[in-house]
């Protein structure tokens, strides 16, 4: 049986699984869908065309599914889609998409979103991502799986953050971070490969060694980006465990629109 506090407001039309818990003074809008075993904290607002999967925990005073902070927005029925097993802590704000993009903001599975984080319209957050307290994502930001964003960091709109990368606290990021790379500073600069994170996630010694070699090619050998990409493609075909991650690195660089941090 759904446990809804008597002070909570659940508007007609909301689709709420019978195992959901909704705390005091929370508000759930008419176009919201909430999956099994999800908990909605007190005073939080779940609005817009928002879908929450299963086993999510929404903290107190979170605002999920709000209108995009985009002056072009004209009340189109854009969406927010959140997967399963996410923790979204207190005072976090996550906005729906805009029609200028694909119209959907997405958050995958198993993410840890700490207090006061902002995820702007049209962001695409993957799986197993950590966004530390007060990290701020502008619109259209893309974050790959297992990325970690330090607290008090700001990320410019349309920036892409590669899988398994890490952005240090209080950083300002205005260009893309390639996968596997650590970055920090204002503005953020590269500081090596995320070796410890890769070890924890089961990357082999050969794969990590190949990524270290790729990092030297990209950042330490004095090459232009185009020259570096030629050598990176050679590394990606060397054979062994390092081929796939180095290939992923090259593909990310090739797809970059804002350019990568250098």
Swiss-Prot record:
GO terms for molecular function: acyl-[acyl-carrier-protein]-UDP-N-acetylglucosamine O-acyltransferase activity. Its EC number is 2.3.1.129. It is an enzyme of class 2 (transferase). SUPFAM superfamilies: Trimeric LpxA-like enzymes. It catalyses: a (3R)-hydroxyacyl-[ACP] + UDP-N-acetyl-alpha-D-glucosamine = a UDP-3-O-[(3R)-3-hydroxyacyl]-N-acetyl-alpha-D-glucosamine + holo-[ACP]. Pfam families: Acetyltransf_11 (PF13720), Hexapep (PF00132). It is found in: Cytoplasm. GO terms for cellular component: cytoplasm; membrane. Pathway: Glycolipid biosynthesis; lipid IV(A) biosynthesis; lipid IV(A) from (3R)-3-hydroxytetradecanoyl-[acyl-carrier-protein] and UDP-N-acetyl-alpha-D-glucosamine: step 1/6. GO terms for biological process: lipid A biosynthetic process. InterPro entries: Acetyltransf_C, Acetyltransf_C_sf, Hexapep, Lipid_A_LpxA, Trimer_LpxA-like_sf. Keywords: Acyltransferase, Cytoplasm, Lipid A biosynthesis, Lipid biosynthesis, Lipid metabolism, Repeat, Transferase. Homotrimer. HAMAP family: LpxA (MF_00387). Involved in the biosynthesis of lipid A, a phosphorylated glycolipid that anchors the lipopolysaccharide to the outer membrane of the cell. Belongs to the transferase hexapeptide repeat family. LpxA subfamily. This is Acyl-[acyl-carrier-protein]--UDP-N-acetylglucosamine O-acyltransferase.
């Amino acid at each position: 049986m759904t446990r809804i506090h008597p002070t909570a407001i659940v508007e007609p039309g909301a689709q709420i699984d019978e195992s959901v818990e909704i705390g005091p003074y929370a508000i759930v809008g008419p176009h919201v869908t909430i999956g099994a075993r999800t908990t909605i904290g007190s005073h939080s607002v779940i609005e817009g065309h928002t879908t929450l999967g299963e086993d999510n925990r929404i903290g107190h005073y979170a605002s999920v599914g709000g209108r995009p902070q985009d002056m072009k927005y004209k009340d189109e029925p854009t969406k927010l889609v959140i997967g399963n097993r996410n923790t979204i802590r207190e005072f976090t704000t996550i906005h729906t998409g805009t029609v200028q993009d694909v119209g959907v903001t997405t958050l995958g599975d198993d993410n840890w979103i700490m207090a006061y984080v902002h995820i702007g319209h049209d962001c695409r957050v993957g799986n197993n991502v950590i966004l530390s307290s007060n990290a701020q994502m502008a619109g259209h930001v893309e974050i790959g799986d297992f990325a970690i964003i330090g607290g008090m960091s700001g990320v410019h709109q349309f920036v892409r953050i590669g899988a398994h990368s890490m952005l240090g606290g209080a950083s300002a990021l205005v260009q893309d971070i390639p996968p596997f790379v650590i970055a920090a500073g204002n503005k953020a600069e590269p500081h090596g490969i995320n070796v410890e994170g890769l070890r924890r996630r089961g990357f082999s010694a050969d794969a990590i060694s190949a990524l270290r070699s790729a990092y030297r090619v990209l950042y330490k050998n004095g090459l232009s980006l185009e020259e570096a990409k030629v050598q990176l493609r050679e590394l990606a075909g060397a054979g062994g465990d390092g081929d796939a991650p180095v290939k992923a690195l090259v593909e990310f660089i090739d797809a970059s629109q804002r350019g990568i941090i250098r």
